[in-house]
């Protein structure tokens, strides 16, 4: 168990405090309120690594095997549709997410330096942002297919590559602003340092801007994009008459639902944590304990999105369903 920072006055203004026992008779007259401030520290709560590490290993193996299988299925035929190309990129991004899981596993047994903390943060947020951008791209492609007649040409394939490079660069740019403010900090009572946002070295406005920009650009605006374009698609499909419209609607709803189910809770608590770090929400031990416990857990659950997309493909692939059911019948 690791101890967090106190909710009252800080005992030491330096980011790496010493742990010598205070002498109550030297240079200072300790009263009851000072003693209360020393002993009433908010103790951070975290899951035991005996629980977290096995879950991460299982998730890592599942994502690797599942996405390798899905990647081979998608590459069996020539890639002619942009939706297939996006699914391939999702598989590759899931392998990048596996690197995030490896960092999380190692973090439970090793002490990261500030440079490694920044690298870990970049890897994690590039995975998150690129995953969100791919879902938005898939949404836009579906909207184009429903509302317009889009031809598959060589020029379009060049555009796919250009869009992919642009989205990767944008994901790196957005992740860098988060990583630049992360440091390896050893707080009062901690056995070893951990990767944290060091708000003491930054202004309140900068802390707030980082918290808001990451959540707005990474979640709220893409979510608004999904709601508008998928809403237009659903309205168009609902009025149309063709056999496969139910399958298309089911696919769209599954992709959006899976993303909201996996990343939605993490972004909500991350936004609250940003407001707390910036001082816009009054600190309390119960709130800090809840955020300290739930954010790593929800981050782990969010990374499960890379494995759940395999199930989305299975549920939406009628050919695979027929083969699966025929195997059960035998």
Swiss-Prot record:
An example Gene Ontology cellular component term from the record?
A: membrane
Disulfide linkage: 117-195
This protein's record includes keyword Membrane: yes
So where does this one cross the membrane?
A: 50-70, 85-105, 121-141, 160-180, 210-230, 252-272, 295-315
Q: Which InterPro entries does the protein's record reference?
A: CCR1-9-like, GPCR_Rhodpsn, GPCR_Rhodpsn_7TM
Q: Which UniProt keywords apply?
A: Disulfide bond, G-protein coupled receptor, Host membrane, Membrane, Receptor, Transducer, Transmembrane, Transmembrane helix
Query: Where does this one sit in the cell?
Result: Host membrane
Keyword Transmembrane helix, does the record have it? yes
Report the superkingdom from the record: Viruses
GO terms of molecular function: G protein-coupled receptor activity
Q: How does it sit in the membrane?
A: Multi-pass membrane protein
**Which family, according to UniProt?**
Belongs to the G-protein coupled receptor 1 family.
Protein name from the UniProt record: G-protein coupled receptor 74
Organism (species): Equine herpesvirus 2 (strain 86/87) (EHV-2)
Its gene is 74
């Amino acid at each position: 168990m690791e101890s967090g920072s106190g909710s009252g006055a800080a005992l030491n203004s330096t980011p790496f405090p010493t742990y010598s026992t205070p002498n109550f008779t030297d240079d200072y007259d300790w009263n009851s309120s000072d003693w209360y401030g020393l002993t009433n520290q908010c103790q951070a709560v975290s899951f035991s690594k005996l629980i977290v590490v096995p879950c991460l290993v299982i998730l890592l193996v599942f994502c690797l095997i599942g996405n390798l299988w899905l990647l081979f299925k998608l590459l069996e035929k020539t890639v002619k549709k942009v939706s297939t190309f996006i699914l391939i990129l999702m598989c590759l991004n899931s392998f990048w997410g596996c690197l995030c899981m490896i960092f999380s596993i190692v973090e439970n047994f090793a002490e990261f330096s500030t440079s490694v903390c920044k690298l870990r943060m970049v890897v994690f947020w590039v995975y998150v942002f690129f995953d969100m951008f791919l879902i938005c791209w898939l949404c836009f492609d579906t909207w184009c297919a429903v509302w317009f007649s889009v031809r598959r040409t060589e020029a379009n394939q060049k555009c796919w590559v250009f869009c992919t490079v642009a989205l990767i660069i944008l994901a790196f740019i957005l992740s860098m602003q988060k990583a630049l403010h992360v440091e390896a900090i050893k707080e009062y009572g901690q056995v070893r340092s951990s990767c944290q946002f060091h708000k003491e070295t930054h202004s309140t406005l900068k802390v707030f801007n980082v918290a808001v920009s990451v959540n707005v650009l990474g979640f709220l605006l893409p979510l608004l994009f999904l709601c508008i374009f998928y809403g237009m698609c659903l309205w168009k499909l609902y009025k149309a008459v063709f056999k496969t419209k139910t399958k298309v609607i089911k696919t769209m709803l599954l992709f959006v639902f899976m993303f909201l189910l996996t990343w939605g809770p993490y972004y909500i608590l991350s936004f609250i944590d940003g407001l707390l770090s910036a001082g816009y929400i009054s600190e309390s031990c119960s709130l800090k304990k809840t955020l300290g416990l739930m954010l790593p857990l929800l981050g782990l659950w969010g990374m499960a999105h890379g494995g759940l997309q395999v199930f989305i493909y299975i549920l939406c692939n009628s050919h695979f369903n027929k083969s699966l059911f025929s195997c059960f019948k035998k």
